[in-house]
Amino acid sequence: SPTNNFATFNPLVNVLNNPTLSEGNLKTTYAASNLWNGSFGTMSVSSGKYYWELLGSGSGYFAGLFLDDGTVNYAASPYTYAQVGMVMIYGEGGSNMSRIDNNDVSGKLFGGTLAGDVIGVAVDMDNGTLAAYNNNVLKFTMDMTASGHWGAPMIPAHMQHSYSGSSSTYNFGQDSSFAGNKTAQGNQDGNDIGDFYYTPPSGFLALCTKNLPSVDVIPSEHFNTVLYTGNNVSGRGITNVGFRPDFTWI
């Protein structure tokens, strides 16, 4: 059985014109021209420091984090900056690299990104910062707490407005060749885990199960039996379950 699992994109949560996922759910290919496409990760984070990479495309994309608590409308365009819970880097091929900060990206340009550039995302959930790298050069560090778009848990997200057939490929530590599009570099995090194109910043780890905090699974917090006697009254509430159930069998 697997001893470690890395984050990927979740094929069950694709929205906004449903991009096609391939290469182990790390490559997102966009089917519709001039329409937004969105992909969202399989692992959320509430604490710790994590790093992942994106093989940059030549067209506009957003890469970063969404709140994973139902706050963000996944089906809305990322241009709706007023959405609380969205922290994103904006990259536009050959034009600019910006950040969403206080619902605005205007005036925050950090140089162009080109197809083939490796974009690094370093997320510090303990201190509320997101750092963006272009080919291992730090472009900016964003204070997510000041932006009003930060919270926990948060989930990796990618959105793109592009031409039909364009794609982006991610690496959460599985494959620094980006599915054969680069020469693998074999860099690891501080726990000697992962295969990154560039060495993660000090203290930042691959987003994988080995690097996530251990979780105590307590059966009574996930399953319970409640006995009651029917009284032929509609609208009756059955209480004392101990948690909010997702599935009830009567």
Question: What do the PLM-derived regions correspond to, one by one?
Answer:
Residues 1-250:
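PRY/SPRY (B30.2) beta-sandwich protein-interaction domains
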